[in-house]
Amino acid sequence: TLNTARNQAETTSKDSIFLDQLLIECMSEFQFLIEQEERDVHLQVIPESARIEGDYAKLSRILVNLVNNAFKYSAPGTKLEVVAKLENNQLSISVTDEGQGIAPEDLENIFKRLYRVETSRNMKTGGHGLGLAIARELAHQLGGEITVSSQYGIGSTFTLLLNLSGNENKA
């Protein structure tokens, strides 16, 4: 829950994280769904050997929540792309789907607790409208932000942005 996410703020850990390993391990949670729905999944890390110091549990939870939403709101057989980029002490992890997209009037509300867009209430998506709120709360705890760009009827991209302090790439 969101309260659990807030309570975890006091226990931020610093782990050595290879970004390719983070993406692969998070996506492994969806392996059955990927195969069942015949998804075309692309993972990319730039540069390939990128490594940071950060809270693995929080980064993993954020990524799992974003990927989970991408699966919920896009059809079987569609493409899902996850790209992690480390450049100039800035980490960005983007999750792009070919789903239904988000109407402009819903964009400002999607990170609110318990908010679900009207079309998702009528779909068999499950969930309670907490995933994006939790992801954003965890991103804030790490000093970052989650942004969204969406074209209604075409798809969405959710991006975690973290400024990493110093030369050690810390998150």
Sequence positions of predicted segments:
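Short helix-loop "hinge" at the ATP-lid/N-box region of the Bergerat-fold HATPase_c
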Residues: 70-71
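Short beta-strand/loop element within the Bergerat-fold HATPase_c
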Residues: 77-89
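Conserved glycine-rich
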Residues: 39, 143-144
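Conserved catalytic submotifs in the C-terminal HATPase_c
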Residues: 15-16, 35, 40-50
